[in-house]
């Protein structure tokens, strides 16, 4: 990892959005990394109906971008509802609280004594204005894996987006983004041997996302 980082600092330091030769070289490095990360996560970031893999500064930014960005992705709609589980990382719970401060409704999905999210209670929380359900793939304290694919199936018919925080699972257990059926998935590189300060948000094709930062056009304007 250190050797790869040193090569990039030496040979790929330019802005990958620039048209000059060093910029295009940097762009090839970035796109190669994007392809490799997508392959690890069972996603497709090339060709028709390609998924989008957005590099971030870490898991916290990826989760915040997912919760706030997807919830507010439809600019014409007013505040709606977001559902999170009771065991989410602070980088999911606090963005949800931020939405609540803006007038959104936030409901919390409870867990069983063994730490598994109560998927059977989800249907009772869904509302016509539900925009997003966010449940982590594996818990950062207990290690319990959550029934994310089941939750995604329950939301798919209603057109509700599902995000999963996979920071603790990526690189340790196989992940197939398409099989999970979620719309967004977050990872952090340092959890599986990568450098600190790098994460990613994987988005299914067609998911609308409100950016957190403005003024740059890289990575689909995010």
Mark where each language-model region is.
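Pyridoxal 5′-phosphate
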Residues: 1-222
């Amino acid at each position: 990892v250190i050797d790869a980082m040193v090569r990039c600092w030496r040979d790929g330091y330019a802005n990958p959005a620039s048209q000059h030769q060093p910029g295009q070289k940097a762009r090839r490095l970035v796109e190669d990394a994007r392809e490799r990360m997508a392959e690890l996560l069972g996603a497709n970031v090339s060709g028709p109906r390609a998924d989008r893999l957005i590099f971030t500064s870490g898991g916290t930014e990826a989760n915040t971008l997912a919760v706030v960005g997807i919830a507010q992705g439809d600019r014409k709609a007013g505040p709606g509802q977001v559902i999170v589980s009771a065991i989410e990382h602070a980088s999911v719970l606090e963005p949800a609280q931020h939405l609540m401060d803006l007038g959104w409704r936030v409901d919390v999905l409870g867990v069983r004594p063994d730490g598994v999210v109560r998927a059977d209670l989800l249907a009772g929380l869904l509302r016509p204005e539900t925009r997003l359900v966010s449940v982590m793939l594996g818990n950062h304290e207990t290690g319990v894996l959550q029934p994310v694919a089941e939750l995604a199936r329950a939301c798919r018919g209603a057109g509700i987006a599902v995000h999963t925080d996979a920071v603790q699972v990526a690189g340790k257990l196989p992940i197939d983004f398409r099989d999970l059926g979620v719309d967004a998935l977050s990872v952090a590189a340092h959890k599986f041997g990568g450098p600190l300060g790098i994460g990613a948000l994987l988005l299914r094709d067609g998911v609308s996302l409100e950016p957190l930062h403005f003024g740059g056009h890289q990575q689909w304007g995010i």
